[in-house]
């Protein structure tokens, strides 16, 4: 059985627990900083909207970096729709040692941690909250789960940790609140105006929080998705268009992308 996250429901918290939440969160932040100290670089991969192949890009980029000789970790921060472990063939369960939770080694040695390692196949992530306020408590528990995935995992010495963010900007803000320093940010879009609009908002949010924008990747490039979304975002934010990735790309494009990072 996979190890459970050490998260209690609202009803399981005592008054002492509730009054000490600030201290507990501070301790978790310090633990995150300690765990990530051996990690040379953190890159958050974001899209702003779903359906652009962001997790696919994250997985193939992680493998290319590993093949280039880098020590690579990959965290699936999409708690509700985790796919990164499957894309990296990182089969669980996670192993718990005296030092913490060990990542699962996937293809090309990429060290992966995903909520999929903690859930039974096909089971949704479900947090319980107090009655009509459950949606508020659910958000707090998801943030706590992200803290534990960062703070309880023995990532070890890594050249780069890729964090696969879910669509939107909420998880980006949670990540930025947790990390001791802002990460680098890589944006994935398709060429359409609609995708570029969503990614624009996400990039603005990242820039306002002090993250360094590495560039944009236009995925699924070709006649199926007309437009110039990648070029538009590159011009607006003065960041490079790192790659146009077609359907069924070969290995060479991933190696080139890894070199550009």
Question: Can you annotate each of these PLM segments?
Answer:
Residues 1-49:
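Extreme N-terminal, non-catalytic leader segments
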Residues 39, 50, 76, 84, ...:
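Residue-level signature of catalytic and energy-coupling elements of molecular machines
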Residues 1-4, 237, 246-261:
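NTP-binding/hydrolysis catalytic cores, primarily Walker-type P-loop NTPases
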